[in-house]
Amino acid sequence: MNKKFLASLMALSSISLGVVAVSTQVTGAISSPTILTEETNVGVTFTNNFNPVDSQSVGTQMSLNALSYEPLIQYNAMKPNVWTPWIATNEVFNATGQVVTFTINPKAEWSNGSPVTAAQVANEFNVINTNAGMNVFGVPTLATPATASGNKVTLTFPTPQFANQDALGSVLIFPVAGDNIPGYPAGSPVYITAGTSTLTNNDVLGNGPYLPTGYNTQLISYTASPHWKMTAKPYVTGVHVPYYAANQDATQALVTHQLDWAGNDIPQIKQVFIASNPAQNHFYYPAGSTVTLWFNVSSSAPDGNRDCLADPYFRYAVSMAIDRNQLSQIGETGFEQPATSTSGMTPAQAAYEGPYKNNYNLNGWTYAQVTKYLKDHGFAVDSNSYFAVNTATAAAQTHLSINTECQFSIQDPTGYSDYAEDEQMISATLQGDHINVNTVGVTTGQWNANIFTHNFDAMIHWGAGGTNPYSQFENWLDDPANTGGSTNYGAYQNSAAQADLVALSGLRQGTPAFQAEVNKLSAIMTNDVPVAPLLYGADWDAYTTARFTGWVTPTNQYAYPGPGTNDVALILTKLTKS
C-alpha cells in the first residue's frame, strides 16, 4: 500500500494537534456563511509580515499578497491572449515592442478611498527599477524612467518586450516611497521601501478586495475592503487562513468542511475527500507548470566541495537516470504526469517543443547506460561503490580534485508529502546506480529561506508555468544578478542563455523567429541541464460547494484555479451563495 495512503488514513483516524489548534478559530468562519476559509501552503510559520516583495513574509509564503495588492491585468494562464481588466484597463505595445502603455482603471482605489493614480504606478516601476531587492517580478531594466500622463503609464525599455506582456501586466501594485497617498505622509509604514522590511497587517494599505485585519500565529483573518469598486460587491465578506503543519492536516480540515478551498496536494483525494461527499467536494488539477529537480551550481551549496553538480555531464546523467513514471504514479498518485521533453515545456506549451519532443525514457536509464555515460565522461566507481571524479577532464568540469566522491542531497519540506516521497524515490534510484544522493527534510519556512540564500544542493520545485515558453525559461535561466535573486535559485549562469532570453523577449509568440529562439533555449536545457524536468505540476485546487459556488472548473476556465496565484481575488469576487 502506498505510504501516502497510509499517512492519509492515519490523519483521518485521529484529528492531529495542528487541526485541533485551529479548529476552534475557524468555527466562526463556518458559522458565518460569507466568510471563506482557505490555505495554499502547509508548515509555514506565521509571522506578522505582509510585505509583498519579501520572500520570507507570510503574505508571500502563503500566497496572500494578491488579496490586498492587485496586478495591473488579470491574465488567464489557462487561455492564451485572454485577460481581465483590473488595476489597468489595457496594456498596449508600440510597433517595436519597446514602449508599453497601461491605462489605469478609474475604479481602482486604495483602501482609504483615494484613487490609484498613474503617477503612483509609474513611481512603483521606477522604484523597483532601481532597487533589485524589490523587483521580484523580473521587470527588465527601463531605458528611461517610467512616466505618467493623465491616466496612462508609459514604460520604455532598451529592447522589445513582447514576450514579457503577461509578466509586466502581472506586477502587483503597492504603495512605495514618493506616492503621496492622502492621509499617509512620507515615512508612513504603509510605504514599502525594501524587500526585507516588515509590514504588519495593521499597516497594509491595499487596493484589493480584502485587508488582513486579524493576525495570530494560528489564524490570519481578512475582511472586505469598503472601497473595493472594480467588481460588484463580493458575496465573500471575509477570508480566514489557518495554519496547518502538513498536507494531511489540510485533508482532515477539507473533509470536515473546516476548509472551503485548498491549494496543496491532498493525499488520496478521491478516497478521503471526494468519496465523503461527491455532490459537494471537488478538485481540479490542470497541469500548470513543470516541476523540476533544481540543481544548485553555485559555490554556496552545502556540498559544493563534493557534489559534482558543476559538471553538465554529471547533471545529465542524474536527469536521465530518474524514473519519471514512478514519481508520477506513486509520489503524485497519478495527478501529475511525467515530463516528456528535456525542454521543460508544459502540455500547454507543447507546440514549442520542436526537436525535443518526447525525448525522455520515462522509466529512466538502466544502470548499464548510466555507467557507460559517466565512465565516458571521466567518472569511475570508487571503493565505496559510488561514482567519483576519475580524470582531469572531469576534474576541470566539476572544479573538484580527482578521486572526489560525488555526493549531494535533495532538500524539500517534510510537510510536502508528495515532494518528500518523490525525493526518496529519486535517491533510491540514483543510489542503485551508484550515485550517492541523499535527502534532507526541513520545515517549509527554512526551505524558503534556503532557496533564496542558495543553501541547498538540489530541490524539487515547481516552475513558472504560463502559456508563453519565455516565462518558464526566464525562471530557470535568467542570471539572478538581473532579477535581484528572485528567480534562478540554482544560480546558473550562461551568457548564451542571457542573449537568447533577450532575443526571445523581443519576438512575437508563434512566429518562426520565436520558435528558433525557443529551440536554442531548449538546447541549453537539454545539454546543460540547469534543472531536470520531472513532472507536469498540477495546480492543486480542492474545494467544496457546501457554501460557495462559481469556482473555476474544466468547463469554466475564467481564471487559473487554486488560491496560490494572482487570480485569487478574481475568483473570490466571482463566488456566490450555493
Question: Which residues does each PLM region occupy?
Answer:
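Long beta-strand-rich cores associated with HINT superfamily self-processing modules
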Residues: Y543-S578
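Ligand-site clamp/hinge motif
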Residues: T198, P226-V272, S427, N436-N438, ...
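Surface-exposed binding/hinge segments that line
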Residues: F137-P189, A546
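N-terminal lobe/hinge region of extracytoplasmic solute-binding protein
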Residues: E39-A95, N126, L205-G206
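Aromatic- and charge-enriched surface segment that lines or borders ligand/interaction sites
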Residues: T89-G133, S149-T156, A250-T256, D307-D311, ...
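Extracytoplasmic/peripheral linker and loop segments enriched in polar/acidic and small residues
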Residues: Y313-Y316, S328, N363, G432-W447, ...
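Structural transition elements
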Residues: Q337-V389, A394-A395, T414-E421, Q509, ...
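Gly/Pro-rich hinge or "lid" segments in bacterial periplasmic/extracellular proteins
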Residues: V58, A77-M78, L172-P234, G238, ...
